[in-house]
Amino acid sequence: FKNKFPNWNRIHLTKVALNIIKMVQDLHEYNIIIGDMNPNNILVQDENTVFMIDTDSFQIEEYPCSVGFNLYTRKINHGKRYDEYLRTKDDDIFALATLVFQLMLPGKPPYSYSGGGTEKENMKPENFPYKCDKSGYNNAPDGQWVYIWSHLPFKLKEIFCQVFRKNLKIELNSIKNAIEDYIYQLEQGHQTLEKKKKTF
């Protein structure tokens, strides 16, 4: 996004997130599982025009999606061959939550932390480095990431904590509602529009 849309702010990123969520909702209504959900398979024309590409890998009925990435795959499915099991809507929602997280903290995977290893090694609930309760931060990445996290709405942080720290399933509508609320707050001037904080 940085090169293609250099003038974008948080409203643009949040609207992209909302349109991806709506796209997933529409497909799920027809029992179509995306399976291989990742940024490379999403084409963004502008914040309101978003397309899913490489749709030949969609899981339809008993035909599994045979490809994927660890980062967008729930931990319980790590080690399995993608073509040997059928994914669920919950698998798509986990991948979607990861994508939305990376839009809110631009480019940063949820389990990335200071001193961490590979993406696959990092993907454990106890490694989620952002503050979810009184326990505080846990080796959060250096730089602006703690600041950005601290300025996200409570509802959205709660959803990320449920998915990445507590390993819980969430409803698609809950993340959609949280993003819609965030857009409203941004448009009303209740939240900063900065994508990244230049100084802490």
Model-derived segments and spans:
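Conserved structural core of kinase catalytic domains
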Residues: F1-K15
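Activation segment/activation loop of eukaryotic-type protein kinase catalytic domains
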Residues: N40-H78
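Conserved C-lobe activation region of Hanks-type protein kinase-like domains
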Residues: V100-K157
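Conserved end of the kinase activation segment
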Residues: N77-D90
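Regulatory extensions appended to serine/threonine kinase catalytic cores
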Residues: N177-E180, Y184-F200
